[in-house]
């Protein structure tokens, strides 16, 4: 039971990390804004992969 909670939280946070930049991209729709959000998402993914080990 204890493993299920953190796993759900991680999935939720991952979804937020993926959805937030895409929503901001839809709102701004400028090529200059697309790059920073993708870089930020990439940094977050590396942080998540490091923390999981």
From Swiss-Prot:
Disulfide bonds: none annotated. It is found in: Cell membrane; Secreted, Extracellular space, Apoplast. The keyword Membrane applies. GO terms for cellular component: apoplast; plasma membrane. A motif (SCOOP motif) lies at residues 37-53. One of its GO terms (molecular function) is LRR domain binding. The keyword Signal applies. Residues 1-26 form the signal peptide. Induction: Accumulates upon infection by generalist herbivores such as Spodoptera littoralis. One of its GO terms (biological process) is response to insect. A motif (SxS motif essential for MIK2 binding) lies at residues 49-51. Keywords: Apoplast, Cell membrane, Cleavage on pair of basic residues, Membrane, Secreted, Signal. Brassicaceae-specific phytocytokine (plant endogenous peptide released into the apoplast) perceived by MIK2 in a BAK1/SERK3 and SERK4 coreceptors-dependent manner, that modulates various physiological and antimicrobial processes including growth prevention and reactive oxygen species (ROS) response regulation. Interacts with MIK2 (via extracellular leucine-rich repeat domain); this interaction triggers the formation of complex between MIK2 and the BAK1/SERK3 and SERK4 coreceptors, and subsequent BAK1 activation by phosphorylation. Belongs to the serine rich endogenous peptide (SCOOP) phytocytokine family. This is Serine rich endogenous peptide 3.
């Amino acid at each position: 039971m204890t493993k299920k909670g953190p796993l759900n939280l991680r999935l939720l946070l991952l979804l937020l990390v993926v959805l937030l930049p895409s929503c901001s991209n839809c709102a701004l729709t400028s090529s200059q804004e697309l790059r920073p959000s993708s870089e930020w998402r990439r940094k977050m993914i590396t942080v998540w992969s490091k923390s999981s080990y």
